[in-house]
Amino acid sequence: SNTVIVDFDLPFGTAGLDFNQDPLQGVANALNQPDRLDPVLLERMMVRCNERLSLFAAPASLDEDYDFSTEAFEEVASKIRSTAPFVGLDLPHLWSGWVRRVLLISDEVVLVATPDLAALRNGKNLVDLLKAHRPNDAPPRLVLNQVGAPGRREIPVRDFGEALGVTPA
């Protein structure tokens, strides 16, 4: 496949739901034993959505605690990156050593945010972190979600982008 979507939001990821998939194995299994992963095992753990897209889904339960090391996430991400030219990592809305590391080693970052004050603050922090640690890289792409949702106060798209120093897509 050309593209793999990896749902690293282990407890609450929705990529499996979004693609109507409920695989027996997924990214949590890979994180349990990253040293055992090879291209054949990875292929079996991923769900092929179509000829050009595969999904590496998060578990659909809270039966386990998901306390994996930064090294495990980095190793799994690296091995997945070797299987396809395009890999999208869906990261959870939390801050940890492994999230930071995955962001810093990514070729490109796409920041998805809602146009509200909390997302502006969090987005600004992420953009500033990436600028400080990746000064020669392009800024992240910005995708604003839920723009114009009824009953919600929002920051205008142009103002949001200007505050981050990034042009919204």
Predicted regions and their residues:
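Phosphate-binding loop that captures ATP/GTP phosphates
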Residues: 2-55
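Structural motif
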Residues: 2-4, 53-56, 87, 141, ...
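Fold-independent oxyanion-binding glycine-rich loops
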Residues: 8-9, 58-59, 91-92
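A short, flexible beta-alpha/helix-coil linker loop
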Residues: 12, 60-63
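Flexible beta-alpha connector loops of hexameric P-loop NTPases
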Residues: 28-35, 62-68, 116-118
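A broad, structure-centric signal for solvent-exposed, well-ordered loop/edge residues
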Residues: 37, 44, 53, 63, ...
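Short, histidine-centered active-site or binding-site loop motifs used for metal coordination
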Residues: 59-60, 144
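Conserved catalytic-core segment of NTP-binding enzymes
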Residues: 67, 71-168
